[in-house]
């Protein structure tokens, strides 16, 4: 795959205190981004969405997401606290 710098962070703002894991920097668009989002949601057993070129997965799943993205060949790093 690509060696793009992919960041996996956590956001709470605007979500009533419920956090989401946010994946940004993916070199994908359209159906490819949707397909990856679907795979990652299934892996985490959680809902989520694709918004403005980022993938949001409900809940705290950063470590699991970083591990899976690295297996897929992305240079994924955990960002934030």
Predicted regions and their residues:
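Long, charged, low-complexity intrinsically disordered regions
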Residues: 1-42, 49-51, 63-81
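A generic structural motif
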Residues: 53-58
């Amino acid at each position: 795959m690509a060696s793009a710098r992919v960041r996996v962070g956590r956001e709470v703002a605007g979500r009533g205190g419920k956090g989401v894991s946010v994946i940004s920097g993916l070199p994908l668009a359209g159906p490819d981004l949707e397909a990856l989002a679907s795979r990652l949601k299934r892996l985490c057993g959680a809902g989520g969405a694709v918004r403005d070129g980022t993938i949001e997965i409900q809940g705290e799943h950063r470590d699991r997401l970083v591990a899976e993205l690295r297996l897929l060949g992305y240079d994924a790093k955990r960002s934030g606290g």
